[in-house]
């Protein structure tokens, strides 16, 4: 038969092993879909599915409940390999990577989830130090996306790097790296604390195993850690309460796709950082240096029911197959399209901080409980539970046990509490008859036998109810009963159902994992969820790997300890919480050979529960002994006759069912009407028969309701009397003949034998696996399944479970005297399942192999073969499994089979050919024998030794099985192994033998036994050692670990075995006393001193016990040693004292104690370092503070000239540095190498210290800037410091100094290189530009102010601050339209800023007023009164939310004078002949322009139309004026030469500095692009000024009359322009002071500059001037080196040059220009408008950089000259009309002549340092003629101006 069963095409199998798609069910994940999904929604390949099912297509039983399950059989594509992180494990012969399954339709109501990247997201936040973050926050500086994290070195990293020597047993000396004072790495003094600080140190041998390999990682595990949340997190973890009886989903649950994550590199016993990415290739093994897993007890109670399944190790929860896991991740329609291996390699290794809880709960569905069930009564039970749990005096108040027989409603009680709890959304609330309950639906055809769960009681949310339990004095006695269930439900935080149908629900690891998941999902424990997200190591501690390895440690460290800590921190409400567990007896069905069942696990863990965490469990009455030791109160449901409450509950249930069903009422009454007496009689009869069973009542009433039972008499003889009779009746109704049952029997057998629920397809394949010929058809099978649908309930994941555990038991076992009809044979089911695995085409994975072995053993089909043939049945069984799979060795070494082994299956695997020396994936790839020896599984060790396991097999750290057994304390295994010949003197790679391992853990009995064993005589061979050496090592090890019993035992045999109390061992080089002192083992030290240990005996490195104790901070040991005669001030080899050592390590208590004992505070070591120096070097602030208070010298220098402040700055603790500075440490101290503390901090990238020192006044020298090179974070801090200094000067009104600091900061910006992120610097640069713009605006240099604002906009186009700043500069320079455009942009970007809105309103009004004035002037051409538009208040910069706010409140004018635009039109004189000076004027105006908002273009052309006749223009400039011109030309020429511009540019733009007129030769095309760079700090590429705004009305009119409407000037107009321009030089001297400094219209952003507004064909002279009163050298001392910006080609629009129409806008000067505070000047302006003299436009046009060279020193200094000035020496002249530009065609025509006049206009105010700011208000505005009176009136109106403080917007 075996031959026939196994007969298959081997060549086909082998050929397809590497190509097949995947194991069905395990490697092809399930799609959970509702029962009401249409059948026709299946894909068209369904027939192929059926055919392949019959032919043995790859398939397996469902895998772990934490993995998705498959609903339809799918054929995978071949050769679909994963190119990603999944690698082929070396342990499996050739594991497949599953293919992509065929897409399966969604269930109805579900939506495809959005693809979610499975790669870990990298945090983009900058990882700079907290101090740097603090600084940035304080300054309000936004770093954007921050500096690349690679540029930051945290203090912790530096600590680790700097203290590497310390961790290696090396003390820091002057080089901060080397010394030999502390123990070596291998010394127990230095490293064993990692081995003993754990709780279970005496139980694990792993404490000295320091390999990076994990003890728990499985390189190809399938339940890896957190097989995280897939869409089934919510879908599969609910209950059947969400479903109707017909299987349809009541409320469509939308699937959410989450990623499958793995965080499995951390075990519960070894703390280690998790790997970065969820898809990290092979899981890192972790060091087992910690507590090893607690050995499992092997005790097992004798149970009433025999243990039918020892399947803990055969659980299909797969921990081994990565390929299986990835197959699950390829689940159709459930996972992201971008699968794990689609992520980029870069992201794969990025650090990952999980934002989700990567844990997944089990799926619990209770088939007998559905939404149409009702729950009646049990209020008394809930009340008793509540009273007992809240009774603090009761010893059994840790929980409650509800005991009851089969069908008594235990599961219904638990489900009621779950439904009303915070998890009610996952497990739908039980339906009830109350109006608030969910709508009930019922389908009689699908009514199933099951427990009654139903409840007419209110089902409102338990969270809102019962927050406060009812008081004891409540009058209404019923209310406490009703509130009890709500109170209990409101405290439920987790639940668990044990179901024999599903192995996973009965296993301890899954229990721990699922409980943890539900705890973090409960509303009450939100803090626990947050903690798991913050600390991924906790999630790793709770993953399935960790739970399999040591569930006790996982539960304790992953659940109980975090919850206790959160409770202590008051992050969890001060309430009691409850965990529900149903059916503990069910878990006994799957008791493992080794390890705990759930009941024994709870018994172990319950003492560790906090008193506020309770358990409510249920158990059958005949299994009470499994919970006999639990401190729980016991509540019984079996006390039926004696408990009236139980009786009332049963009656209430019957009454409810009868009244709610007309069918039942019609059945029991003759007339179909409700007769109370009859109903009461029926109720009483049923209650008496059921003996308290709700299940009996439910099934019986269901029969009544469907009409299967009809009561014809009062005897009720037709009513069954027991559950057995009810099941028999139901089966008889389903199967009318025996043959009908026989056809369905195989299905029941398979369902009984399976370890977990199976889908219809899996059952179908198992049935056909038993057929050699004539396979069953799918339609026939479907009919059988339909017949069994009332017994095998289909769950949400399409798997099937028995309707009730009692029915499952009834099918396999009957009591004496009961009918044996319908008995099933599970053995046949096991055989069918084994055949199914055998006929599977693809290779079985580890879990499937173990499961196959389980089914082969359970089937036992070769029973009796030995009697017939003499061959043991185990041989054919071994052949069977050997032929069926190739991965026997891998299955034997699977993780679950190691920790909870199935001995019988393991034997079968070994018989089949598994390698007993196979290396596992735990304990540093130890062989199986080593792992089992470590775990103490004696039976498995014996089995392995029986089959020849190698005794000398070692793990990667060199430990053999004897070392592991000795370290773990397994005495029996040590004896067994030594008797089998294990070598006692074997050394691992650390040089430790089994004797030392036992001494380290304190196992004195094993140590004594090993001493009595035979040791090798003679000289030790390599890898061995003598017994005396081992004993000396054991003494040191025991002393360091504090095992006094072992130390005493060893000292007692000192004479016999040559043990010296002062001896130094050969392993660590320690004496017993130095080891104990370094560990702080005071008791051992006292014992050793009593036994004669020398107090001053040093170890091999020369470190005495006193230094060992002082270094580790054990002051009690120090006191003991000093009391025994030690000197308090000894010196070691480096000259250090114990005080220095203690200070270096930061042990304040030890430092205090040593000083109290007279330790010298001023002692210096050989490097000149004191105790304070060492404390500063290591950053121990508390010690530093104490030493300084005790009088330590704060400026003590070492041999290298370093002070404690230098060392503290080197370490990087900002608070220590701050303390030292506040205590008087010299902040500018320079050591022998020329370094200061600030330089050291910068060099070490200690940003917090840099910030602290800068705050305290540290100066920035060249060394600091040099050290900051390539350190962007530090450089930003230094630049911010410069900007802060500038801000301070700005607030003090020192504009020049502030601008210098800003310029200096700009020069220090790094050059942009490849790979550098300049965004943070750009933000800072923007702030500097804005601050410079404010400075220039305050010094009246509006052109540069505008330019800097434009530069800020270049870097940050969306900066509303920059738009605002530029708008203010434009407004001040009378460019209202351009300012309006910028303000409108600013309002768009920041619509809530009130200051911008206020200024916008003003500018709009000014524009309107300007237009009105122009119209009035055209109607009545009279000069308008001056307009003072510069007294508007400017809001503080803080209102604009500048990055680095400068208090511009100081710019506010306290004057209440508002902008007043005179409404009266100015009388305009009649037009005159075009002036002959216009051509010279026009030549001067041809300079580079600046792009601006287009609105400003029209403003220029409009204002150009204004002409105002100004009298008194002299024909030649004065001598002094020519001198000024010469100076300016020299300055401009030097500037251009120094900036390496071409000589052509110099000659064309800067004519010879001669007082005689000269022509400017400038080509029309070239002159536009030529520019010079100024010498001043703000000399950027600037063109001519915006003087079009200043044009007088009369001049504009004259120009209009002279123009021909074309862009080319007529020859007749040329001379007039020449004559006008020739004498414009005087206006230079007059216009500058009249403005309080020239309005620099040199902003490259604005087309209002005249060179751009001129016709493109006209020549232009881009002359750049510097009108600074300071010298060139002083003005260039802080030059920023800005590159001059060339003209913008966008400004060639000629349309703006045509000045046509009479509606052109003009800009009258109705008020004095900004800064005029003199009342006389204002009065003259107001009362004498005709005498107003507009300053020459040539000054604005040609003095392109006027007032740009040195921040307008002229304006920032108070004038000293009298009103005469040099202007008083000038000849009277008529000032040309302001604003006359080359827009006018008439002017353009005259450009070819009199170019020699240009130099006359290019004057510098260099000699006007003391010149008052003259306001030529008295100059008569009359037709152009020379007038002495006009000259006099001009001079009288000129008033000195006070230093300008910007008070106007």
Curated annotation (Swiss-Prot):
Expressed in heart, lung, liver and kidney. Expressed in brain (at protein level). The modification N-acetylmethionine is found at residue 1. SUPFAM superfamilies: Ankyrin repeat, TPR-like. PROSITE patterns: ANK_REP_REGION (PS50297), ANK_REPEAT (PS50088), TPR (PS50005), TPR_REGION (PS50293). Keywords: Acetylation, ANK repeat, Phosphoprotein, Repeat, Synapse, TPR repeat. It holds the Pfam family Ank. Gene3D superfamilies: Ankyrin repeat-containing domain, Tetratricopeptide repeat domain. This is Protein TANC1. The gene is Tanc1.
């Amino acid at each position: 038969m075996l031959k026939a069963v196994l007969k298959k095409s081997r060549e086909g199998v082998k050929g397809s092993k590497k190509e097949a798609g995947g194991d069905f069910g395990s490697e092809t994940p399930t799609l959970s879909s509702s029962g009401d999904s249409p059948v026709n929604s299946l894909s068209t390949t369904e027939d192929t599915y059926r055919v392949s099912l019959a032919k043995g297509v790859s398939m397996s039983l469902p895998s772990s409940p934490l993995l998705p399950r498959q609903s339809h059989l799918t054929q995978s594509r071949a050769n679909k390999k994963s190119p990603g992180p999944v690698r082929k494990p070396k342990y499996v012969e050739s594991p497949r990577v599953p293919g992509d399954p065929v897409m399966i339709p969604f269930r109805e109501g579900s939506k495809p989830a959005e693809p979610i990247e499975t790669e870990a997201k990298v945090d983009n936040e900058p990882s700079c130090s907290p101090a740097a973050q603090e600084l940035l926050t304080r300054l309000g500086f936004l770093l954007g996306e921050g500096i690349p994290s690679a540029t930051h070195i945290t203090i912790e990293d530096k600590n680790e790097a700097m203290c590497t020597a310390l961790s290696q047993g090396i003390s820091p000396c002057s080089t901060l790296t080397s010394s030999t004072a502390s123990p070596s790495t291998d010394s127990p003094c230095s490293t064993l604390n990692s081995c003993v600080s754990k709780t279970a140190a005496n139980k694990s041998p792993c404490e000295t195993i320091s390999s990076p390999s994990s003890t728990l990682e499985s390189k190809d595990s399938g339940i890896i850690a957190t097989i995280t949340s897939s869409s089934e997190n919510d879908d599969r973890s609910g209950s059947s309460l969400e479903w109707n009886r017909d299987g349809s989903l009541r409320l469509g649950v939308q699937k959410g796709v989450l990623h499958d994550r793995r965080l499995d590199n951390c075990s519960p016993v070894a703390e280690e950082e998790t790997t970065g990415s969820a898809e990290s290739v092979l899981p890192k093994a972790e060091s087992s240096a910690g507590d090893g897993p607690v050995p499992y007890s092997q005790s097992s109670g004798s149970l009433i029911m025999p243990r039918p399944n020892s399947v803990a190790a055969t659980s299909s929860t797969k921990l081994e197959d990565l390929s299986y896991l990835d197959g699950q991740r390829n689940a159709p329609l459930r996972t992201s399209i971008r699968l794990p291996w689609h992520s980029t390699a870069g992201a794969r290794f990025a650090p990952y901080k999980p934002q989700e809880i990567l844990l997944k709960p089990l799926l619990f569905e209770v088939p007998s409980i559905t939404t149409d069930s009702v729950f009646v009564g049990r209020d008394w039970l809930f009340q008793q539970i509540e009273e007992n749990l809240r009774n603090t005096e009761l010893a059994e108040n840790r929980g409650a046990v509800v005991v009851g027989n089969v069908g008594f409603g235990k599961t219904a009680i638990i489900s009621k509490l779950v439904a009303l709890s915070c998890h009610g959304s996952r497990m739908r609330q039980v339906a009830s008859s109350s109006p608030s309950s969910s709508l009930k639906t019922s389908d009689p055809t699908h009514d199933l036998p099951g427990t009654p769960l139903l409840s007419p009681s209110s089902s409102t949310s338990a969270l809102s109810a019962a927050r406060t339990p009812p008081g004891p004095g409540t009058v209404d006695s019923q209310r406490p009963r009703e509130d009890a269930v709500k109170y209990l439900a409101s405290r439920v935080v987790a639940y668990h159902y044990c179901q024999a149908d599903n192995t996973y629900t009965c296993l301890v690891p899954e229990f721990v994992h699922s409980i943890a998941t539900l705890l973090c999902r409960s509303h009450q424990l939100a803090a626990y969820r947050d903690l798991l997200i913050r600390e991924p190591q906790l999630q790793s501690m709770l993953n399935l790997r960790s739970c399999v390895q040591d569930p006790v440690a996982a539960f304790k460290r992953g659940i109980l300890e975090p919850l206790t800590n959160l409770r202590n921190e008051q992050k969890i409400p001060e309430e009691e919480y409850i965990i529900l567990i149903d059916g503990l007896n069910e878990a006994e069905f799957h008791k493992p050979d080794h390890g705990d069942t759930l009941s024994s696990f709870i018994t172990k863990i319950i003492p560790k529960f906090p008193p506020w965490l309770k358990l409510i469990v249920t158990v059958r009455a005949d299994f009470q002994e499994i919970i006999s030791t639990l401190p729980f109160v016991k509540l019984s449901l079996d006390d039926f006759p004696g408990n009236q409450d139980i009786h009332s509950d049963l009656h209430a249930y019957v009454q409810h069912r009868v009244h709610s069903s007309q069918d039942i009422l019609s059945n029991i009454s003759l007339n179909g009407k409700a007769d109370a007496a009859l109903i009461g009689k029926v109720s009483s009869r049923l209650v008496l028969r059921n003996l308290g069973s709700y299940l009996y009542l439910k099934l019986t009433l269901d029969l009544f309701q469907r009409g299967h039972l009809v009561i014809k008499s009062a005897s009720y003889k037709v009513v069954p009397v027991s559950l057995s009779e009810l099941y028999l009746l139901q089966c008889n109704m389903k199967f009318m003949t025996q043959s009908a049952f026989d056809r369905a029997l195989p299905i029941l057998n398979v369902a009984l034998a399976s370890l977990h629920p199976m889908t219809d397809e899996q059952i179908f394949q198992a049935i056909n696996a038993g057929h050699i010929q004539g396979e069953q058809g799918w339609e026939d099978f479907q009919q059988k399944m339909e017949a069994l649908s009332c017994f095998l309930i289909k769950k949400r994941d399409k798997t099937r479970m028995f309707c009730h555990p009692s029915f499952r038991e009834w099918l396999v076992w009957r009591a004496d005297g009961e009918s044996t009809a319908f008995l099933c044979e599970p053995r046949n089911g096991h055989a069918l399942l084994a055949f199914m695995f055998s006929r599977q085409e693809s290779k079985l994975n580890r879990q499937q192999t173990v499961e196959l072995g389980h089914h082969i053993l359970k089937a036992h089909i070769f029973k009796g073969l030995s009697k017939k043939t003499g061959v043991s049945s185990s041989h054919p069984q071994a052949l069977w499994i050997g032929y069926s799979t190739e991965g026997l060795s891998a299955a034997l070494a699977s993780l679950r089979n190691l920790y909870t082994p199935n001995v019988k299956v393991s034997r079968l695997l070994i018989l089949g050919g598994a390698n007993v020396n196979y290396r596992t994936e735990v304990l540093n790839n130890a062989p199986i024998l080593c792992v089992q020896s470590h775990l103490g599984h004696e039976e498995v060790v014996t089995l392995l030794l029986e089959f020849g396991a190698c005794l000398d097999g070692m793990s990667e750290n060199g430990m053999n099985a004897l070392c592991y057994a000795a370290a773990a304390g397994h005495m029996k295994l040590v004896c067994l192994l030594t008797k089998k010949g294990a070598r006692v003197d074997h050394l691992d790679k650390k040089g430790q033998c089994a004797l030392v391992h036992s001494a380290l853990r304190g196992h004195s009995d094993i140590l004594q036994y090993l001493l009595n064993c035979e040791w090798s005589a003679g000289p030790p061979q390599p890898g061995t050692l003598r017994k005396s050496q081992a004993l000396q090592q054991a003494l040191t090890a025991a002393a360091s670990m504090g095992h006094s019993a072992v130390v005493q035992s060893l000292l007692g045999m000192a004479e016999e075995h040559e043990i010296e109390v002062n001896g130094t061992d050969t392993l660590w080089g320690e004496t017993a006393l130095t080891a104990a002192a370094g560990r702080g083992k005071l008791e051992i030290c006292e014992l050793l001193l009593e036994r004669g240990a020398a107090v001053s005996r040093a170890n091999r490195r020369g470190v005495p016990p006193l230094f060992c104790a002082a270094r580790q901070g054990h002051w009690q040991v120090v006191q003991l040693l000093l009391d025994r005669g030690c000197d308090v001030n000894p010196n070691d080899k480096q000259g250090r004292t114990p005080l220095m050592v203690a200070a270096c390590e930061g042990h304040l208590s030890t430092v205090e104690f040593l000083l109290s004992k007279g330790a010298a505070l001023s002692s210096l070591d050989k490097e000149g370092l004191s105790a304070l120096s060492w404390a500063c070097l290591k950053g121990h602030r508390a010690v530093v503070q104490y030493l300084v208070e005790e009088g330590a010298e704060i400026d003590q220098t070492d041999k290298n000239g370093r002070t404690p402040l230098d060392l503290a700055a080197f370490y990087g603790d900002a608070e220590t540095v701050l303390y030292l500075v506040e205590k008087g440490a010299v902040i500018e101290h320079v050591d022998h190498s020329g370094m200061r503390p600030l330089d050291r901090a910068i060099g070490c990238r200690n940003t917090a210290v840099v910030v602290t020192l800068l705050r305290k006044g540290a100066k920035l020298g060249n060394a600091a800037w040099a050290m900051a090179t390539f350190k962007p974070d530090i450089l930003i801090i230094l630049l911010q410091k410069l900007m802060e200094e500038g801000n301070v000067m700005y607030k003090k009104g020192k504009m020049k100094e502030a601008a210098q600091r800003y310029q200096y900061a700009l020069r220090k910006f790094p050059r942009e290189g490849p790979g550098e992120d300049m965004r943070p610097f750009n933000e800072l640069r923007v702030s500097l530009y804005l601050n410079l713009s404010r400075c220039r605006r305050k010094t009246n240099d509006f052109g540069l102010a505008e330019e800097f604002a434009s530069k800020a906009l270049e870097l940050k186009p969306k900066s509303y601050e920059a738009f605002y700043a530029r708008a203010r500069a434009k407004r001040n320079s009378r460019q209202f339209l351009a300012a309006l455009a910028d303000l409108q942009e600013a309002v768009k970007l920041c619509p809530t800023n009130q200051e911008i809105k206020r200024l916008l309103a003003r500018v709009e009004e000014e524009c309107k007023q300007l237009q009105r004035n122009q119209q009035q002037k055209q109607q009545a051409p009279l000069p308008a009164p001056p307009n003072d538009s510069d007294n508007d208040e400017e809001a503080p910069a803080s209102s604009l939310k500048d990055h680095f706010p400068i208090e511009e409140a100081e710019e506010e004018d306290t004057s209440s004078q508002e902008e007043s635009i005179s409404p009266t039109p100015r009388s305009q004189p009649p037009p005159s002949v075009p002036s002959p000076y216009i051509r010279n004027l026009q030549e001067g105006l041809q300079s580079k322009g600046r792009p601006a908002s287009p609105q400003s273009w029209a403003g220029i052309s409009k204002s150009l139309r204004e002409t105002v006749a100004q009298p008194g223009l002299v024909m030649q400039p004065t001598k002094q004026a020519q001198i000024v011109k010469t100076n300016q030309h020299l300055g401009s020429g030097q500037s251009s030469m120094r900036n390496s511009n071409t000589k052509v540019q110099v000659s064309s733009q800067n004519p010879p500095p001669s007082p005689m007129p000269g022509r400017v030769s400038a080509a029309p095309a070239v002159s536009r692009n030529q520019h010079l760079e100024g010498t001043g700090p703000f000399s950027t590429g600037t063109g001519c000024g915006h003087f079009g705004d200043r044009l007088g009305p009369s001049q504009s009119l004259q120009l209009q009359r002279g123009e021909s409407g074309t862009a080319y000037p007529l020859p007749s107009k040329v001379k007039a322009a020449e004559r006008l321009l020739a004498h414009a030089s005087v206006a230079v001297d007059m216009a500058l002071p009249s403005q309080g400094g020239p309005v620099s219209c040199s902003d490259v952003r604005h087309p209002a500059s005249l060179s751009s507004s001129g016709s493109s064909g006209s020549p232009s002279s881009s002359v750049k001037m510097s009108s600074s009163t300071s010298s060139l050298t002083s003005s260039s001392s802080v030059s920023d080196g800005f590159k001059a910006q060339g003209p913008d080609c966008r400004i060639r629009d000629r349309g703006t040059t045509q000045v046509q129409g009479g509606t052109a806008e003009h800009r009258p000067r109705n008020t004095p220009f900004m800064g005029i505070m003199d009342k006389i000047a204002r009065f003259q302006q107001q009362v004498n408008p005709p005498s107003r003299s507009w300053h020459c436009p040539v000054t604005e046009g040609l003095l392109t950089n006027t007032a740009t060279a040195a921040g307008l020193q002229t304006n920032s200094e108070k004038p000293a000259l009298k009103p005469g000035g040099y202007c008083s020496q000038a000849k009277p002249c008529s000032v040309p009309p302001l604003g006359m530009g080359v827009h006018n065609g008439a002017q353009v025509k005259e450009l070819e002549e009199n170019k020699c006049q240009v130099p006359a206009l290019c004057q510098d105010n260099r000699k006007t340092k003391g010149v008052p700011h003259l306001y030529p208000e008295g100059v008569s505005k009359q037709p152009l003629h020379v007038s002495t009176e006009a000259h006099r009136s001009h001079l009288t109106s000129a008033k000195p101006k006070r230093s300008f403080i910007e008070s106007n917007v």
